[in-house]
């Protein structure tokens, strides 16, 4: 039997979803869950450093060898990410769902303190959508882990990255046939991109204290670039990797305007999910939408067979 996954939001966003016929995959660093994109930083660099000291292998970077060369590469990567995180340059576009459509913690945290709604979508249809873009977009059930388990994940990913570093220079020489100075540039560039990919893996995890949320996330498999020339420009010569994803984002990024911020997002067309994507809307415990008004809204924007019901939770602000 198909499962319904619920997206909690305020009433204004519900109207935007229905009238614009699109969901918004928004910059996660501007959300309640902004810490998750930093989950593996700087821990993974520290773990790689510790692992290399314990089991060193021949390594060269920028004229320096072994431990000194590796330390130099780690420091450059650390400095890059410290600055980029501060500037909002390392992020992902995410939309969150919950397995339960009438849950107090979700009303409080994600639906305007119960004044909003939850919108039900088919898990199967969301999976089919992500399959159409399987090299770019994923939908995953969040895995809830203890701090110790998250640390073990970081250590395992650090070991994996170190193994990739062993052969990175040879791979660059074989594929780019470039000068020595370009080799160093590519070494740092690809190491940073390798770390970015690993940082995006953190979106699959949350601390076990949030386990009751039963959350699912749809997100991009690779980090979002906020480079203007990639998203809005004509020059693609600088592209090295993630080209297919950059092409999908090109000229599509838009902005949600808050009183004190702008939040970039990727619009996900509901028609690309299903002919009848919205299965149900649940009115929150402090929401005042009446059935007839909701039916008029559905009629105006040509939504058929959308179930509507009220929260059964007794909750007042």
Question: Language-model segments: which ranges?
Answer:
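Partner-binding and oligomerization surfaces adjacent to conserved cores of proteins
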Residues: 1-317
């Amino acid at each position: 039997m198909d499962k319904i996954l619920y997206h909690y939001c305020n009433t204004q966003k519900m109207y935007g979803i229905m009238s614009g016929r699109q969901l918004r995959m928004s910059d996660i660093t501007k959300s309640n869950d902004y810490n998750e994109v930093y989950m593996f930083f700087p821990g993974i660099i520290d773990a790689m450093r510790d692992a290399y000291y314990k089991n060193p292998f021949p390594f060269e970077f920028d004229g320096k060898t072994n431990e000194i060369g590796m330390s130099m590469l780690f420091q450059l990567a650390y400095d890059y990410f410290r600055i980029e995180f501060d500037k909002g340059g390392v992020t992902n576009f995410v939309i969150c769902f919950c397995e339960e459509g009438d849950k107090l913690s979700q009303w409080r945290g994600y639906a305007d303190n119960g004044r909003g709604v939850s919108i039900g979508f088919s898990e199967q249809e969301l999976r089919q959508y992500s399959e159409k873009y399987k090299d770019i977009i994923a939908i995953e059930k969040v895995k809830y882990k203890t701090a110790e388990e998250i640390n073990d994940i970081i250590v395992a990913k650090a070991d994996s990255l170190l193994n990739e570093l062993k052969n990175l220079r040879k791979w660059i020489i074989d594929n780019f046939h470039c000068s020595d100075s370009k080799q160093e540039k590519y070494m740092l560039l690809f190491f940073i991109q390798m770390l970015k990919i690993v940082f995006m893996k953190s979106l699959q995890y949350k601390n076990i204290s949030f386990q009751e949320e039963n959350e699912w996330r749809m997100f991009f498999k690779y980090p979002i670039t906020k480079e203007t020339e990639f998203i809005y420009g004509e020059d693609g010569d600088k592209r090295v990797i993630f080209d297919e994803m950059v092409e999908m984002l090109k000229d599509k990024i838009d902005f949600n305007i808050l009183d004190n911020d702008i939040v970039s997002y990727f619009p996900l067309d509901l028609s690309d999910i299903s002919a009848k994507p919205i299965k149900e809307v649940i009115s929150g415990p402090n929401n005042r939408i009446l059935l007839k008004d909701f039916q008029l809204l559905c009629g105006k924007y040509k939504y058929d067979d959308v179930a509507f019901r009220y929260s059964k939770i007794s909750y007042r602000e």
